[in-house]
Curated annotation (Swiss-Prot):
This is Succinyl-diaminopimelate desuccinylase. Catalyzes the hydrolysis of N-succinyl-L,L-diaminopimelic acid (SDAP), forming succinate and LL-2,6-diaminopimelate (DAP), an intermediate involved in the bacterial biosynthesis of lysine and meso-diaminopimelic acid, an essential component of bacterial cell walls. The active site is at D68, E130. Zn(2+) 1 binds at H66, D99, E159. PROSITE patterns: ARGE_DAPE_CPG2_2. NCBIfam families: dapE_proteo, PRK13009.1. Homodimer. Gene3D superfamilies: 3.30.70.360, Zn peptidases.
Amino acid sequence: MAFAKALIQAPSVTPDAGQALDVVADALKAAGYHVERLVFSTAGVPVDNLYARIGTASPNLCFAGHVDVVPPGDAASWRHGPFSGAVEDGVLYGRGAVDMKGAVAAFLAAALAYGAPAQGSLSFLITGDEEGPSIDGTAKVVDWLAAKGEVIDHCIVGEPTNPNALGDMVKIGRRGSLSGLITVEGRQGHVAYPHLADNPVPRLVRLLTALTAAPLDNGSAHFPPSNLEVISVDVGNTAYNVIPGAATAKFNVRYNDLYSLESLMAEIARRLDTAGEPYVLTFRDGASESFLTAPGPFVETVLDAVADVTGQRPQMSTTGGTSDARFIKSLCPVVEFGLVGQTMHMVNEATPVADLTALTAIYERLIARYFATFAA
């Protein structure tokens, strides 16, 4: 609880998370962790990150999270100040309480209570660039870890995975995300003289019909069906008597493990080609692959730890948006479990203190079960 309040009271609107990282670093240094602050500034804005470890042997269990937060909006709209860390009627208020300073605080408390593993290591990967472009955060830290030969055996990410109550859901994977732009060129002209123009809109409509006529798939063992949404159609035309010279459509696909990034791109192009219309297709940078940590000893360890405290075995899920787990998957198996996500990014973001206490207990059980299983 003390860590959660201290983190909330350290304003850290992305990417300015240095004060909140200081809270984590100071606590870990005092407990004997070797702490490294990693600053990257590819995008021109310095971003502070942290990697800390106690122990030198395997297995290395890592907790990954972020202490940057989205802007609070109008502070006057909050029941308590967004960075107050106020507690009222057993509820902790503040930006980041759920997403995800609460989980960072809970694992920090759990790890310090456990101490140094007799065999193996505990580590923390905490970023200040998850709510922003995610360029100079976890992705760069993962590259840095790989370059120095740092081995992480398993990772738990503290995203707010539970839809309704603590213990509902553990994320064992995430869908991939791909965004694209379709451009159709025409020739601008007067609507009264269509023979002198070339309207691109009907051709774009035919292309979009071909793209969306059939489902991409029917889902897989652990993933729902892939889903393509057309999110914008634009012609840049406000007049009623002008045929536009070009038309564009933007789309996003959330896709499962039946596709790789390359095979999905090929399928999109194949569908568009069936329309028989000329088009230009471009894909936006920043696409991510789907990933899955298959059920096995690590996933079971997490599920058992949750059940130990809540009395219920959580659902394994791959729903929702992307997270920094998409970067960590290249290092090791990764699973996500944190608080209830109902108020994340909202005015009056809050979590019951009882949930924080229970999450800390879950993380304590997870650490104990992990080393009993993997360090034996």
